[in-house]
Amino acid sequence: MAEQYDAIIIGAGIIGASVGLELARRGWRTLNVDRLPAAGYGSTSASCAIIRSHYSTLDGTALAFEGYQYWRHWSEHLGVADERGLARFEEVGCAVMKTSSNGYLKSICENLDTLGILWEDWDNETLKKRLPIYDLRSFAPAKLPDNPGFGEATGPAIAGAAFMPQAGYISDPQLATHNVQVAAEAAGAKFRFNTNVTKIRQVDNAVRGITLA
């Protein structure tokens, strides 16, 4: 028997589940379909779950910084409790080294300044004090372990770093996705797992539905 939805989202990782949540909150009848057994079991679970705002484009930086606000206020964003608990945002900051290959972060720091995002300019003395285990020598370009010169310094010290305090990581990306699923279901969204999509049906170049295995 065919089921009718306003939107069908293929995938229930952190992106797919979030799409379902936001559409459901706007009154759409949504269905997330995933071939895996639970939300966030695919590439989301393999994610290092870094939350950062330093990107090469202004639009990307602005979008990331908006997302950072949701992670900071995760409980308020979800609006519901999850019996498994909530994922934590560990706001430890992020240091990025300045090198010739990344333009010494000039354009990235300009984007941060334009949007009023906090960052600190660390010289090598500060970097060594804050991260004493760090080797400040340059090893670029990257080499494979069996290449000649692997692990050998190739140049002088790096040129310091930019430190962004409004950054960190999520304690458990799969749990975070389950949190989103619970919030989406509270808003009326539906999820189907262990389900393979075999066809995306189209009529007159418009998607009309999906066929399941």
Please identify what each model-predicted range represents.
Residues 2-15, 31:
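Beta1/beta-strand and adjacent pyrophosphate-binding region of the FAD-binding site
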Residues 48-148:
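Dinucleotide-binding Rossmann-like beta1-alpha1 core, especially the glycine-rich loop
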Residues 20, 24, 183:
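Gly/Ala-rich phosphate-binding loop of Rossmann-like dinucleotide-binding domains
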